[in-house]
Structure formats: C-alpha cells, structure tokens
C-alpha cells in the first residue's frame, strides 16, 4: 500500500492494520481500499493496490489485507454504529477555503488548510479526539470549538457561535476572521465584521510580515 505523495514511501509492516483499526475505533463502519488491481498504464500505474503487477497473492500487501479481512470478519457487526463523541471541534469549510484562496492583497502565505492543521496536530498528539465539522453544524455538544481563519461567516453562524459561548463553551478564533458574508462580500463597518462584538475587538489595519 503506497502513499500518493511527492515521495511515495511504503507503509511499514503492520502500519495499514494499525490505521485501519484506528479508523474503526473512531467510528468507521467500513475500511475500504483503492485500488483492487494495480493499473498497467497511465499516471497511476505505480499507485498501490491489493493485487500488484505480479498478479498473485505472494506479496506483503495482499497478505496484510487478507489478514485484516479475516480479523474484521471475526469481529463481525459488534462495532457497527458505534461513534466517538469528541468534546472538541474544528470548523472547516470549503467555501471559506475557496474564498480565501481567491482573494489577493494580503499575503500569499495565508494557508487555510495548514492553519487548521496547526490546531489539529497538537490535539492529535495529545490523544484528544476532535471532530472536523462545517461552520453551520450544531455546536451544543462541544466544550471547545476552534474556528481557524473564519474569513467567511455564513447565515446563522454568528448567532450559533454567540450562543455557544453564552452556554459556557470556549471559542478560539484566529487571524482573518469575520471578513465577508457567504457571498464573499466584505462586511462593512469594521473588521472582524459580524464577529466584532463576539471577539471584543476592532481591527483598524492589516499588515503582513515578509518571510
């Protein structure tokens, strides 16, 4: 099983089994693989597969997948429908990402996915379960909500965040928040737009540090 990265290093022996059980432990009802048979041509011909170019079952990948299947069959449906219930959530929104990436004038170093990962990584390393949810989802069951680069504020989000904080939740905002509405139009009256009262700040100017 290969990663599909600039350097496609193989997963170490037992690593696939480990991350498969990790997924199941976090609520996954199925573990699926792409692809069954390795392609013979085109750009993905070296992409990992269960059945490799050799065409038989005499390789580590096939054996490890077969072992996992045997083990999961023994477990059966005992874990189906089980769910982890984290108390921490990170808001991540694709429209927000596209709007940030489509804007010019501040800094090309603004990186929405990386900003989210900077919050996720230490939580993961500390074994703190985290849900990654859309900005318009229900926040009532969380104790901590992190909203990295909440540049776009969709309808209902302001009220939802304010209610979450009033109910005792802890909200973490980062740079570049509250700038536009759901149509990527700047909310006039001062940054951070609809989140001014919630954040308790008014941003007069933006500036960017050079690398």
What are these regions (language model features)?
Residues 1-211:
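Carbohydrate-binding surfaces of carbohydrate-active enzymes
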